[in-house]
């Protein structure tokens, strides 16, 4: 089919139900139909409930083998549940200069904008689309792209523009978190013999290392940013 304009594409995507607990294949197929001239990689999987899902990676620009770099646009196909709607959540109508429907802001409108922007770039400019699903729940689509996408690795974009509507204004970063579980293994023995190996002693060294990192993040200005709270480390329990 011929490419659709931004508003038309956003409305078409809104009209397809892709709440996180249902399949997004119809949305993925509709998006792929808009990507003529792009190399498209499909990454299919079953979610934890056995529902068929698909993430997409698309790339265009440069010559084969020399098309790395450039910009990647990223967005997700799934939406939150339709709780609280008093009108048809998948109507996709335009009223009062606004697109109405579930996911019109988060994030089928922005996703449509990514697609239209990528298509508008000169064919010689490398551009990649990273289109995920299950963003509202398990992040499984993004995890799959990171772990298995051959095309994303080959494209090696220099920067990523994520179209998530954070406070409805461009931001240059997003705070995240990481959790680590450290395990030390000892050798069991009676505490009076000294013949065992007490794993707690090894963990004390780990805790000291974590304290040093905590102090560095708290005190070293190189890790601080006026737009964010300072990065923070917590040792929860031993």
For each predicted feature, which ranges?
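Acidic/His- and Gly-rich active-site-bordering loop/insert found
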Residues: 2-102, 123
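Midchain, well-structured core segments that form catalytic/ion-binding scaffolds
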Residues: 149-236
